């Protein structure tokens, strides 16, 4: 079954011989019919073929591997008739080394991916690993080499991201996340830490909010269970001084924390259109002048050095952009209108909007408008490495993952097969970028990005 899944995924990701340009060019040059056709592609195939050569020929190949690298395809054919045997050869030489996106490894889960692809740091090797959950509720930790380190069955699905904290302030990390009824804290061996998981007083539909006010690892965990809101310390104990214990309607997104001008701002949106701006005690810091018809878009904070140069932005359910100032007013002079159900995010200084099959990005490094063919776009993500910016977006309907660089161009070799938004990272800290995405059968792909 596993081999069959791999074959299906290779076909869908166009990682099979029939999709190779070199193979297609070769087939156009040689006879359609032959008694025997022997085909070799790239230098790795040539190395493999030496086992079928006589000693002198095999030795020649092994001694001249570097010189033979530009050979991208080789075919040898034999045709027999009643008296004679005819042979012909085809050799394709490529003087320019091609930049290709390669599938480094794949990992097959027991079921399709349910969670986001979460990157977590291995505190021993400093490399990045993957924490994911499949639809059978199995939680996996996967190494940077594509090996499943452990698998653990949970009772419920994980909500939102899996994050990391340094509970003991010793540079050793634990994974923190929640399900509908519990908050988990798990070490890198998959074991529960301290009194975790803690049972919630009431079920929640939202991921937890994780705050580190002073960047001193004295974490706070905010859980919004409908209209009720509970603040915990990092040991899973309730904070008694938290003031906003109840709202008139449920929170619609996890609360976010920002520091602007040396002051704390906790932002929480309610279902009834109320936007709360709180201090770290849960007391109201700013009263917003009007209610907002919130959509699925979270509140994005465009952060300056002061509150006067900062603002909160969202696109409401009618497609209207709301620019909320930190004095509580809404600046109508800066409002724009978009189509309903426009997805909006402000990330790394860039405004990212997706609607249907159209992607718009505006910012200091990437500026593009790209229309995909009848696509169903997932939210795009921006990444920056070594002063270069990249944007990943996936067409869920077409099962294609795209990667743009800051020249506003699609990177060579893309799109590639993928059903989830690609996550970009240098997994092994070797200067080589990896794009991680997954397929519909539960296969995770690690693509090399040149």
Name each region found by the language model:
Residues 1-24:
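Single conserved position on a long alpha-helix in the C-terminal lobe of the eukaryotic protein kinase
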Residues 31-100:
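Leucine-rich, highly hydrophobic segment in Treponema pallidum outer-membrane-associated proteins
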Residues 96-115, 147-154, 193-202, 239-247, ...:
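Aromatic (tryptophan-biased) beta-strands that constitute blades/sheets of beta-rich domains
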Residues 106-137:
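Beta-strand-rich domains and repeat architectures in extracellular enzymes and scaffolds
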Residues 112-118, 157-165, 202-211, 248-257, ...:
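Repeated scaffold domains used in trafficking and secretory/extracellular systems
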Residues 120, 124-127, 166-174, 212-220, ...:
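Acidic, glycine-anchored loop motifs typical of Ca2+
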Residues 136-140, 180-184, 226-230, 271-275, ...:
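Loop/turn residues immediately N-terminal
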Residues 421-450:
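Blade-level signature of beta-propeller repeat domains, shared across WD40, Kelch, NHL, RCC1
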């Amino acid at each position: 079954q596993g081999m069959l899944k791999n074959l299906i995924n290779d076909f869908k990701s166009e990682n099979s011989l029939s999709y190779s340009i070199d193979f297609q060019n070769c087939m156009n040059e040689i006879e359609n019919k032959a008694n025997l056709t022997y085909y070799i592609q790239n230098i790795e195939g040539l190395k493999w073929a030496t086992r079928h050569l006589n000693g002198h020929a095999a030795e020649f190949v092994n001694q001249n591997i570097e010189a033979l690298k530009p050979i991208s395809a080789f075919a040898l054919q034999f045709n027999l008739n009643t008296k004679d045997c005819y042979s012909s050869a085809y050799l394709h030489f490529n003087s320019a080394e091609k930049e290709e996106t390669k599938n480094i490894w794949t990992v097959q889960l027991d079921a399709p991916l349910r969670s986001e692809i979460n990157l977590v740091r291995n505190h021993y090797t400093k490399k990045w690993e993957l924490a994911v959950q499949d639809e059978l509720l199995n939680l996996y930790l996967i190494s940077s080499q594509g090996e499943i380190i452990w698998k653990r069955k949970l009772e419920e699905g994980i909500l939102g991201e899996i994050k990391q904290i340094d509970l003991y302030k010793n540079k050793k990390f634990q994974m923190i996340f929640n399900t509908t009824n519990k908050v988990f804290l798990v070490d890198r061996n998959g074991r529960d830490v301290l009194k975790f998981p803690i049972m919630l007083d009431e079920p929640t539909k939202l991921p937890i909010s994780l705050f580190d006010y002073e960047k001193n690892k004295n974490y706070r965990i905010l859980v919004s269970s409908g209209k009720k809101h509970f603040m915990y310390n990092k040991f899973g104990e309730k904070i008694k001084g938290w003031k906003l214990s109840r709202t008139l309607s449920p929170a619609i997104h996890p609360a976010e924390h920002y520091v602007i001008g040396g002051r704390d701002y906790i932002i929480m949106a309610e279902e009834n259109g109320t936007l709360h701006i709180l201090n770290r005690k849960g007391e109201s810091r700013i009263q917003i002048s009007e209610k907002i018809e919130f959509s699925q878009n979270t509140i994005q904070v465009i952060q300056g050095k002061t509150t006067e140069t900062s603002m909160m932005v969202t696109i409401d359910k009618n497609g209207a952009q709301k620019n909320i100032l930190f004095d509580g007013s809404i600046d109508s002079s800066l409002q724009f209108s978009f189509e309903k159900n426009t997805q909006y995010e402000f990330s790394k200084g860039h405004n990212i909007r997706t609607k249907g099959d159209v992607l718009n990005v505006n910012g200091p490094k990437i500026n593009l408008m790209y229309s995909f063919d009848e696509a169903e776009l997932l939210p795009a993500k921006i990444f920056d490495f070594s002063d270069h910016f990249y944007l990943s977006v996936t067409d869920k309907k077409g099962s294609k993952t795209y990667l743009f660089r800051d020249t506003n161009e699609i990177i060579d070799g893309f799109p590639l097969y993928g059903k989830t938004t690609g996550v970009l990272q240098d997994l092994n800290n070797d200067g080589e970028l990896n794009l991680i995405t997954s397929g519909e059968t539960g296969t995770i792909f690690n693509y090399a990005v040149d």
